[in-house]
Amino acid sequence: MAVYNYDVVVLGSGPAGEGAAMNAAKAGRKVAMVDSRRQVGGNCTHLGTIPSKALRHSVRQIMQFNTNPMFRAIGEPRWFSFPDVLKSAEKVISKQVASRTGYYARNRVDVFFGTGSFADEQTIEVVCANGVVEKLVAKHIIIATGSRPYRPADIDFHHPRIYDSDTILSLGHTPRKLIVYGAGVIGCEYASIFSGLGVLVELVDNRGQLLSFLDSEISQALSYHFSNNNITVRHNEEYDRVEGVDNGVILHLKSGKKIKADALLWCNGRTGNTDQLGLENIGVKVNSRGQIEVDENYRTCVQNIYGAGDVIGWPSLASAAHDQGRSAAGSIVDNGSWRFVNDVPTGIYTIPEISSIGKNEQELTQAKVPYEVGKAFFKSMARAQIAGEPQGMLKILFHRETLEVLGVHCFGYQASEIVHIGQAIMNQPGELNTLKYFVNTTFNYPTMAEAYRVAAYDGLNRLF
């Protein structure tokens, strides 16, 4: 058994692991990374964010071809199979792996491929694919092993027509009808993707409103677009049992209803990848979803062990995970890079997409903050008209007395890009965070960014 000594060992090579390893390495520390795959990137690159967003992009291109009258001169609408569309995602995955492999090589991060677990508080044993065991001894260890779909024990996920958000990427055909159980972010994104491929989608939600953490107007807009695009949303429903049959799946609901489809996609919750880490050997406990508790420095109950990313729970976003990993390493190397990541933009890649940051109307009303609203509808924006993307809006919430920007909510074309302009202004100190920035700044024309100017004028016109 070979023994290696490091300053920092990072378990996992997803966004959190990458952020941690790169920050520690650039601070001059000797760093090792352990990943259970034979390639870096984690679930984000191989099963989650990257393939699903690449898949969504391809589906949007198909939708644009099929709905734009200009293309009728070329031919009639075309429908592509799910496996064909998935091929484009696979190309992106390989490029991402190559990029990240290069990052670690240039920064002298040693990467070990195998299953890593704690032997004690400073030792990780890595069982490689060939059976060889390596021992890594480190001053500090960062757990960034991510998460996987939560799988209830009473559902047969080995049935060929029952999938979760990881295994759906192995789907070898295009179903005519699909049940998506769970209307969280992942469920809504996949409902959009399959609807764009012409699949009839039954989206089962155990809550009374889609993505209830969003501004209610944005949530209602999403519901409207879903119902307009062959997605039937069933609210306040819970599964009783899932029955896999030869020609499909039957979902039995506690309300007594039954739904039959060609396949079922389970998207109801996630579980931290902690069950094979040997945490019992170091006294670190997890909650019912396998998640680790950390303090504001991302330190666990063991002084030299940290956690970051999906494995610690909220907000379970790739963007936040990277910053959490970077901050965990910042706590170790003390290079001024630490911050507690608690105010991140939400990016939801439905069709149309959604993004937001800051407070929503419900929260401001409950807190009795005197706010006002400014809106810009994309159907009136020149750039949206040119792009053939009239659906959507930008909504700015601001303090009616100080004009401080309190929240930005966007639904539609390029929403996840547009939100960052508002984020930049909201992060300015004191009086520099003001709605007046948008009316006193020249925006390129035509752009989607100028929606901020339109929304700001709309908001100012409401004041008296």
Swiss-Prot record:
Cofactor(s) in the UniProt record: FAD
Primary subcellular site in the record, as a coarse category: cytoplasm
Domain of life: Bacteria
Catalytic activities: NAD(+) + NADPH = NADH + NADP(+)
Cofactor note: Binds 1 FAD per subunit.
Keyword rRNA-binding on entry: no
Record's keyword terms, sorted: Cytoplasm, FAD, Flavoprotein, NAD, NADP, Oxidoreductase
Flavoprotein as UniProt keyword: yes
Top EC class for this record: oxidoreductase
InterPro entries: Class-I_Pyr_Nuc-Dis_Oxidored, FAD/NAD-bd_sf, FAD/NAD-binding_dom, FAD/NAD-linked_Rdtase_dimer_sf, Pyr_nuc-diS_OxRdtase, Pyr_nucl-diS_OxRdtase_dimer, STH_gammaproteobact
A GO-annotated cellular component: cytosol
Molecular function via GO: dihydrolipoyl dehydrogenase (NADH) activity; flavin adenine dinucleotide binding; NAD(P)+ transhydrogenase (Si-specific) activity
Compartments (UniProt record): Cytoplasm
EC number: 1.6.1.1
Example GO BP: NADP metabolic process
Residues reported in the UniProt entry to bind FAD: D35, S36, R37, R38, Q39, V40, G41, G42, N43, C44
Family: Belongs to the class-I pyridine nucleotide-disulfide oxidoreductase family.
Role this protein plays: Conversion of NADPH, generated by peripheral catabolic pathways, to NADH, which can enter the respiratory chain for energy generation.
Full protein name: Soluble pyridine nucleotide transhydrogenase
Lineage: Bacteria, Pseudomonadati, Pseudomonadota, Gammaproteobacteria, Pseudomonadales
